[in-house]
């Protein structure tokens, strides 16, 4: 017998064998060459499927390679300045930048850095 996916083929002639769970008795018989296989051979079969990355092409997956998903520390820079009170020192000015860290249907994450004391925090919009 030869197993391809969840299909079971006869080793002698290559014909598709019946589903062992649907066959009465203790054996599975090939309808073409009459080869006999004990049903016990099929009891612990594990079906594992895999696909190549390019098996299901999509325009969304093609765009994924264009979107940068990680940043280095020095790439964040200072960001824009906003009038926002620092919860640590009370300074009225902070730098901020946003990143889309969660799924696209959720808001961006805003990172704040105090221009005075350097305190950092983030909020999820």
UniProtKB/Swiss-Prot annotation:
Cellular component GO terms, alphabetically?
A: nucleus; RNA polymerase I complex
SMART domains for the chain: RPOL9, ZnF_C2C2
Binding residues annotated for Zn(2+) 2, in chain numbering: 86, 89, 114, 117
Query: Which GO MF term does the entry hold, naming one?
Result: RNA polymerase II-specific DNA-binding transcription factor binding
Domain of life, source organism:
Eukaryota
Family of this protein: Belongs to the archaeal RpoM/eukaryotic RPA12/RPB9/RPC11 RNA polymerase family.
**Name of the protein in question:** DNA-directed RNA polymerase I subunit RPA12
The species is Saccharomyces cerevisiae (strain ATCC 204508 / S288c) (Baker's yeast)
Q: Which gene encodes it?
A: RPA12
């Amino acid at each position: 017998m030869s197993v391809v996916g969840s299909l079971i083929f006869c080793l002698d002639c290559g014909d598709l064998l019946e589903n062992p769970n649907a066959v009465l008795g203790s054996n599975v018989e090939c309808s073409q060459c009459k080869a006999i296989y004990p049903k016990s051979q099929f009891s612990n079969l594990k079906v594992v499927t895999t696909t190549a990355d390019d098996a299901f092409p999509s325009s969304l997956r093609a765009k994924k390679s264009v979107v940068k998903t990680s940043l280095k520390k020095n790439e964040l820079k200072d960001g824009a300045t906003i009038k926002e009170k620092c919860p640590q020192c009370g300074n009225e000015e902070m730098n901020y930048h946003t990143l889309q860290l969660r799924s696209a249907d959720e808001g961006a994450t805003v990172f704040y850095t105090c221009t005075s004391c350097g305190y950092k925090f983030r909020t999820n919009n």
